[in-house]
């Protein structure tokens, strides 16, 4: 193996790890050669009401596409996360919660969590929620967000969690798509010292004339702040649960029954509802959580992701709780009120495993390591990275300053669509290289292909595809199976196309190079450029807009918008700021353009297609080698854009 920047598995980790390198090789070969035998055995890690007899029934044929795992088995996800732990660890802590203000702390045992989930499940049933109904959850990072999810799973309802930073329009589009009759929210959220008007945003979303299905809004009293109230529709959480029974029988669900929807950005049009089912997802989330983080009973596990993202679903809720872990939930942001907060939380709660994002690591790095002078960190054993490729400088800083050079880093690559981690080191098995996601998890078969779909061998670079299914894979786009087929299986026949590019080095390690479609990765969160463009063009003074990502020191990628104004409109700094606020209101703060460049024209082919590769290069200040511009209707547009670019190095 090439030794350049190679970090070997620490001896103490290797000696006690669940999997060493030899075991990894053996298990991986078995998982690929005999997936039915491998997954049939490992699916026993969760409790089945009716055991399955068939393991894998999948087809990647785009004319006849289907994905089924364990499909004749039945189970309940809530029971797997709660009930099965009561006898052996009912009094163990399931959730440690710390508020945005560190003075607010709460510990919830498995027995207490079970009772709360049952009460809320009974309340949902009393409000008329039935098996298969989609319940929309728009909550802050409080214990009750997890309670709401598990209560839905308990009664067979499908939860659709919306990130608490999204705008009323984003909420509305998800409610409409899911036809939700019931919403769950809080009066306000608290994040970074600021109050977020969650109920106010819900009210605004529900005031839209095209939102017609919602009958009930359950509101958690988080801050006690003033809220508008719609009699008959709005109900307080504490009132609907008051007196509700603390036992609730679980609904027996088929392995292929939906567990949740989670909307993710596509390269075109509206966000798509990624549908995950119950059996395969839970097997995969729990198994990856245990093996990737080398989780040992009794350890405190902290995933810093918001519950509104897939990482929060798989590695804050379902994976860890199915494994009987103690999870830490932090309401705020880990660098508020100062960059020292992350270290303080780790020390205060003796966190053993930390799973966070490169964007936070880069933000802490920019503030300086002096903020960690008083950080002990001896409790930390394993650290993870998620959301986007981590640059080697940030990896090393994380390893040295947070991990004190003794914690293995698992740099994990996966997607909302994959349900769980696909390419990752295993702490006791994989020597790591800063910036590389390394090797595939069990049962995962990655390949690199050229633009014609030919498989590339050896050390090379190409489009990242997956050759066969795994249990955690999404099953469809909610209500639009054709979009599922078109998005993931039409580009390269017989393969799942990830939308990412990657290179494979001489050791077979994978390095993710980023999106190859029109999706931007901002602070580890995916945004479709089409969404941001649509928001800009909705403004009366904007004639046309093109949006691309560009390298950003903190966020990984920033949002760079080229805007053509309507005839006669003056391009002013005031208008630029107005457009930034406009997008923020339309989609959410995450989508706010970092840079808006006025453009009298955009580079288009004669057929009118915008050539984004030129825009990406200009935004990245890579102007010396733009490539062939002969297909453009007006090549002079390029010179004008270069001349007025905003992201200059000089």
From Swiss-Prot:
Catalyzes the conversion of acetate into acetyl-CoA (AcCoA), an essential intermediate at the junction of anabolic and catabolic pathways. AcsA undergoes a two-step reaction. In the first half reaction, AcsA combines acetate with ATP to form acetyl-adenylate (AcAMP) intermediate. In the second half reaction, it can then transfer the acetyl group from AcAMP to the sulfhydryl group of CoA, forming the product AcCoA. InterPro entries: Ac_CoA_lig, ACAS_N, AMP-bd_C, AMP-bd_C_sf, AMP-binding_CS, AMP-dep_synth/lig_dom, ANL_N_sf. Coiled coil: none annotated. Its cofactor is Mg(2+). Its EC number is 6.2.1.1. GO terms for cellular component: cytosol. It comes from the Bacteria. Mg(2+) binds at residues 537, 539, 542. GO terms for molecular function: acetate-CoA ligase activity; AMP binding; ATP binding; metal ion binding. CoA binds at residues 191-194, 311, 335, 523, 584. This is Acetyl-coenzyme A synthetase. It comes from Shewanella amazonensis (strain ATCC BAA-1098 / SB2B). It is an enzyme of class 6 (ligase). Keywords: Acetylation, ATP-binding, Ligase, Magnesium, Metal-binding, Nucleotide-binding. Acetylated. Deacetylation by the SIR2-homolog deacetylase activates the enzyme. One of its GO terms (biological process) is acetyl-CoA biosynthetic process from acetate. Belongs to the ATP-dependent AMP-binding enzyme family. ATP binds at residues 387-389, 411-416, 500, 515, 526. The modification N6-acetyllysine is found at residue 609. It catalyses: acetate + ATP + CoA = acetyl-CoA + AMP + diphosphate. PROSITE patterns: AMP_BINDING. Disulfide bonds: none annotated.
């Amino acid at each position: 193996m090439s030794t350049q920047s190679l970090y070997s598995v620490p001896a103490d980790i290797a000696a006690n790890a669940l999997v060493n390198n030899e075991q990894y090789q053996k298990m991986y070969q078995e998982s690929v050669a005999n997936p039915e035998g491998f997954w049939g055995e490992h699916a026993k890690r969760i409790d089945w009401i009716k055991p399955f007899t068939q393991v894998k029934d999948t087809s990647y044929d785009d004319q006849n596409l289907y994905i089924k795992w364990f499909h004749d088995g039945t189970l309940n996800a809530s029971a797997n996360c709660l009930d099965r732990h009561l006898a052996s660890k009912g009094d163990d802590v399931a959730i440690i919660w710390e508020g945005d203000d560190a003075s607010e702390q709460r510990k919830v045992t498995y027995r207490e969590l079970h009772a709360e989930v049952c009460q809320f499940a009974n309340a949902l049933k009393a409000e008329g929620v039935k098996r298969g109904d989609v319940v929309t959850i728009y909550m802050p990072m409080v214990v009750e967000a997890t309670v709401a999810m598990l209560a839905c799973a308990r009664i067979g309802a499908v939860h659709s969690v919306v990130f608490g930073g999204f705008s009323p329009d984003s909420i509305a589009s998800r409610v409409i798509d899911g036809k939700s009759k019931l919403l769950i929210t809080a009066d306000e959220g608290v994040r970074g010292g600021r109050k977020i008007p969650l109920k106010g945003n819900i009210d605004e979303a529900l005031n839209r004339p095209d939102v017609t299905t919602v009958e009930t809004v359950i509101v958690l009293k988080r801050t006690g702040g003033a809220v508008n109230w719609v009699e008959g529709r709005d109900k307080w959480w504490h009132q609907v649960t008051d007196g509700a029974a603390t036992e609730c029988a679980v609904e027996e669900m088929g392995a292929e029954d939906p567990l949740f929807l989670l909307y993710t950005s596509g390269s075109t049009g509206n966000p798509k509802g990624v549908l995950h089912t119950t059996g395969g997802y839970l097997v995969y989330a729990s198994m990856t959580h245990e093996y990737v983080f080398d989780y040992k009973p009794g350890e405190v596990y902290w995933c810093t992701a918001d519950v509104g993202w897939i990482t929060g679903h798989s590695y804050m809720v379902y994976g860890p709780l199915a494994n009987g872990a103690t999870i830490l939930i932090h309401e705020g942001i880990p660098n508020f009120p100062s960059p020292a907060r992350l270290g303080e939380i780790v020390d205060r709660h003796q966190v053993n495993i930390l799973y966070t994002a490169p964007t936070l690591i880069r933000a802490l790095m920019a503030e300086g390591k002096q903020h960690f002078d008083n950080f002990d960190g001896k409790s930390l054993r394993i650290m993870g990275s998620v959301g986007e490729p981590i640059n080697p400088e940030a990896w090393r800083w994380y390893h040295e300053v947070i991990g004190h050079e003794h914690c293995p880093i698992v740099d994990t690559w996966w997607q909302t669509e994959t349900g769980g981690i696909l390419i990752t080191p295993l702490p006791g098995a994989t020597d790591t290289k800063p910036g590389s996601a390394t090797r595939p998890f069990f049962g995962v078969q990655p390949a690199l292909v050229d633009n014609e779909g030919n498989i590339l061998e050896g050390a090379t670079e190409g489009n990242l595809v997956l050759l066969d299914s795994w249990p955690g894979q999404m099953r469809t786009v909610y209500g639009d199976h054709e979009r599922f087929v078109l998005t993931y299986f039409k580009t390269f026949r017989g393969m799942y196309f990830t939308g990412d590019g990657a290179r494979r080095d001489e050791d077979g390690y994978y390095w993710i190079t980023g999106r190859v479609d029109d999706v931007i990765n901002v602070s580890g969160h995916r945004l479709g450029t089409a969404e941001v463009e649509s928001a800009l063009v909705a403004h009366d003074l904007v004639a046309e807009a093109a949006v691309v990502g560009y390298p950003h020191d903190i966020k990984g990628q920033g949002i760079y918008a080229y805007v053509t104004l309507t005839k006669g409109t003056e391009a002013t700094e005031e208008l630029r700021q107005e457009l930034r606020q406009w997008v923020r209101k339309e989609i959410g703060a995450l989508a706010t353009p970092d840079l808006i460049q006025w453009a009298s024209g955009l580079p288009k082919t004669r057929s009118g297609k915008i050539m984004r590769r030129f825009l990406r290069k200009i935004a990245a200040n890579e102007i010396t080698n733009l490539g062939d511009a002969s297909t453009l209707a007006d090549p002079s547009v390029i010179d004008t854009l270069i001349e007025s670019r905003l992201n200059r190095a000089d």
